């Protein structure tokens, strides 16, 4: 079964996010548990935590289908010691907030070398940051997002993700989130069924589907292999509908949060409905195969 939603607002308190997900017909969602453009935030109150859990239950959404995103300020591969420690502290705080809310996943961008250290050293530093975070906060799984490779951001090659995972001590607490726009901009073609099969086979060979914990479903304003991160509404960009139809019909993408970050929020309900229709067709075809 497919679990599809969007990165919804948590304005007024994290407890509002499940309600906002229900309003667009979602059975999964993403959120920020604090202001993503500030280093520090007030601690979550007991009232807010309890209300979030209650609203999540009322929404009929399981915690494992929620994909929180950390602050954009965090750089777990920062080349400078003071800034690295600041990022690590903020990341541990983000993990702690997820634990308080009963959420088992935290999605994050890996980091940037800022032209001050070698990319390989930066990737190793990111893995070290993850290991330290795991030692500080129990249980929550750290989910590395692939990037478009804009600027000095790492994580745009599947090999980057694999190198980080290889250096993480507790493999049960690391996974990846693949953003379709980022992958396309980084040189992984998704425009046809054949292209999807090739790109996803490469992902499976280098990283492995066992590490896929979530996805961001975005079309791309940016050109193929441009290394530019520009999202677009589904079907309105340079990727097109075929990539998303492919995902909906492939059971390797079952039971993980599939999250829209597309640019026109007024289209989210329509986009979710269309994806869900393809998913239902795939499920019916699978059931027909089982009974024949």
Swiss-Prot record:
Cofactor or coenzyme needed: Zn(2+)
Q: Does the keyword Zinc apply?
A: yes
The note on the cofactor says:
Binds 3 Zn(2+) ions.
Print the keywords alphabetically.
Answer: DNA damage, DNA repair, Endonuclease, Hydrolase, Metal-binding, Nuclease, Zinc
Among the Pfam families in the record, one is AP_endonuc_2
**EC top class, in one word?**
hydrolase
EC code(s) of this entry: 3.1.21.2
**Record CDD domains:** AP2Ec
Sequence positions that bind Zn(2+) 2? 145, 179, 216, 261
List residues binding Zn(2+) 1.
Answer: 69, 109, 145
Q: Which residues bind Zn(2+) 3?
A: 182, 229, 231
Write down the chemical reaction(s) this protein catalyses. Answer: Endonucleolytic cleavage to 5'-phosphooligonucleotide end-products
Q: Name one GO molecular function term.
A: deoxyribonuclease IV (phage-T4-induced) activity
Protein's GO biological process: base-excision repair
Q: Does the keyword Protease apply?
A: no
Similarity-based family: Belongs to the AP endonuclease 2 family.
This molecule's function is given as: Endonuclease IV plays a role in DNA repair. It cleaves phosphodiester bonds at apurinic or apyrimidinic (AP) sites, generating a 3'-hydroxyl group and a 5'-terminal sugar phosphate.
Report what the protein is called: Probable endonuclease 4
| Species of the source | Desulfotalea psychrophila (strain LSv54 / DSM 12343)
Gene name linked to the record? nfo
